């Protein structure tokens, strides 16, 4: 019973803070701008990093929701830095896979194939 009361109190407080932030002007526009900037990254990364990207953006979005609801600039800054770090890691992985090949010449055999199967899978000798 005590836990239910605390959860109810927390949710009421979040709703109250969101209402107060609407009148002051909040930073939802900034997060929408970040979301629009992330859309071009979704298309090339759906093969390799799609699930990672969706989880990362979802967790950052939930964090941004609470940061916007509480009006805390420090929390907003932390989630903005987290989003930038995630984007940098995903882009570095994408560029590493694109420009590093086993031959060491900087060119990949097939640029569209970003998801390679594990080494243990031998697809030439598969039996059905």
Curated annotation (Swiss-Prot):
Transmembrane segments in this chain: where? 28-48, 71-91
Q: Name one GO cellular component term.
A: plasma membrane
- Chief location: membrane
Region spans: Disordered? 101-128
What this chain does, per the entry, is described as: Involved in mercuric transport. Passes a mercury ion from the MerP protein to the mercuric reductase MerA.
Bilayer topology:
Multi-pass membrane protein
Q: What is the protein's given name?
A: Mercuric transport protein
Localization recorded for this chain is:
Cell membrane
Domain of life of the source: Bacteria
Question: Where is Hg(2+) annotated to bind?
Answer: 47-48, 114-115
* GO MF, one example: metal ion binding
Q: Which UniProt keywords apply?
A: Cell membrane, Membrane, Mercuric resistance, Mercury, Metal-binding, Plasmid, Transmembrane, Transmembrane helix, Transport
Q: Which GO terms describe its biological process?
A: response to mercury ion
> From which organism does this entry originate?
Staphylococcus aureus
